[in-house]
Structures are given as structure tokens and as C-alpha cells.
Amino acid sequence: MKITILSGGTGTPKLIQGFKEILPNEDISVIVNTGEDTYIGDIYLSPDIDTVLYTFSDLINDETWYGLKGDTFFCHEQLKNFGFDEVLKIGDKDRALKMHKASSLKNGVKMSEIVDIERKSLLINSKIYPMSNEKVESKVLIEENNEKILLKFHDFWIFRKGNAKVLDIFYENSNYAKAANGVLKAIHESDFVLIGPSNPITSIGPILSISEIKNALKEKLVFAVSPIVGENPVSGPAGTLMNAKGYPVSAVGVYEYYKDIVDVLVLDNSDINKKKDINCEVLYANTIMKTIDDKINLARNILDYYKSR
């Protein structure tokens, strides 16, 4: 059985940990959001790609879901001594991965090729693809002192900690972007596609904003795991951003966002009362993943449901 997973950088990697324990890793492909990618100085941040790489290689710092566990921060501290205070604390080994991306991009190497080099160097058997080799950037329109300001998502979330009145979210350049090498083939060859429990607006939305990808998904069986339980996001600013796009912060809002492509919506057991407002198949399970057993059980529930259809 082959599956393709659409992933951001927090919720979905937890579920990936479950799938990689119960499926041959070579049968898992992941298409990753790059809408938050940005340069900081001479390094290139691709936070969701890096988190997925570290998740598959069992190196992820699963307390922060960012960076490497056990990393050191000598470079970060030395930069502070020079007056260059990085808002995002980047570890030394993690910095090497980001330097590799920056150098490769400046030398004209495509992002899909860069990620594949890194995947192989980390001895990962699963395939990992950036959503596009072209720059698609998530932008957040906020209002501050009666003035509208357009921010990179990185600036909104890291610098401002998400503390702003959000008016809208855009995916800059998505109208012109193409799916990265291998993405459409992975979708076509998979038995089903899984949209993981990442932020629908800024983790999955950028992927779906590429028309080639969304059109390919319409031809496949698609599962989607809701990242919202009750009326609360499991993590991150999903609630604020869904409100800004006009969707209710609930499982119903997640369904409305994905309704053009989703066939099976995976909801937490506590959301059983939401079924009447959802016009697709619903699988109920424990979607709060605190332990490795939780992650494996959710992955297994999804696979069992697929096999029973």
C-alpha cells in the first residue's frame, strides 16, 4: 500500500511518526508546505521541510517540533555577542542544513533536488517533496493602528508571536507555480492521499493553492485529519487564520475548507455531534497524539478504515 501525505511542520509530523512504524517507509511519500520559507542572513529557512526530514530520521526535537534534539547553540550565542540577535534560536547542526539549502539555491539547484540530497544523506527511505520548486509565499494581511500591513508568515508568527488583527491570508505567486518534480507522480501512484492535522490555512492551503496539485487530488481518495478539536486548534494560530478566511473554528470549518477534495474526514471522538453538518464520510478516532502509541493507533485506524471501504 502506498500513501501520500500533505504536511506542514507540527501536527502532521506527529502522525508521520505513527505511519512510519506500521508501513514500509519506501511506501510513504510526503508533500511539504514551503510557503513559510525565507532567508535569514546567509541561511535559508524551510521549517516544514526540515521538520519532516528530522521526523523521518528520528532526530526531531519533539518538545518544540523544530530543530534537532540535543543540538548545541554556540553559533547562535556568538552571533548575539556580535549584536545579531536571531529571533529564532537555530542550533549548530540544524544551521548546517539551512546553509546547505542557501548555498545550493544560490548555485541554481532546484529545491526538490536539494531536499532529495538531504533525504538520502539522512538515510530516509520515504520520498519527501517540496510542494513546488518555485517561490510561493504565505502572506498575512494585518491591521495595526488603522493601517493595513502585509507580512510574511514568518514575521507574523515568529516576530509578532501571532499577536495581530488578521484580515486575510494570501499565497503569493501560487497562480504561476507548478508542482515540484515527483509530486504529481506520488499522488497518482498512491492508494490514497492523507491531509495531515496541520494548519489548514498556512500549512495545507499553500499546497492546495497550486492548481496542478488540487486538481490531481480531485481524482484521488482523500482523507483529512482535523487539527481542531471542539472549537480549539490543537496547536498554532489555525483558529485566528480560519476566522480571517471566514471559516468557523471547528471540525465543520475544516470540512468546509476541504470539501472540494475530501472523501473521509477524521475527527476526534469528542466531535461526534458535528457529523450532521459534514457531507462526507467521517472516521472518529483519538486525534490527540501525546504518545507514540497514540500516533500509531491513529495511523492504524486510518489504514483499517481504508481497507474496510
Curated annotation (Swiss-Prot):
CDD domains: CofD_like (cd07186). Its EC number is 2.7.8.28. Pfam families: CofD (PF01933). GO terms for molecular function: LPPG:FO 2-phospho-L-lactate transferase activity; magnesium ion binding. Keywords: Magnesium, Transferase. GO terms for biological process: F420-0 metabolic process. Catalyzes the transfer of the 2-phospholactate moiety from (2S)-lactyl-2-diphospho-5'-guanosine to 7,8-didemethyl-8-hydroxy-5-deazariboflavin (FO) with the formation of oxidized coenzyme F420-0 and GMP. This is 2-phospho-L-lactate transferase.
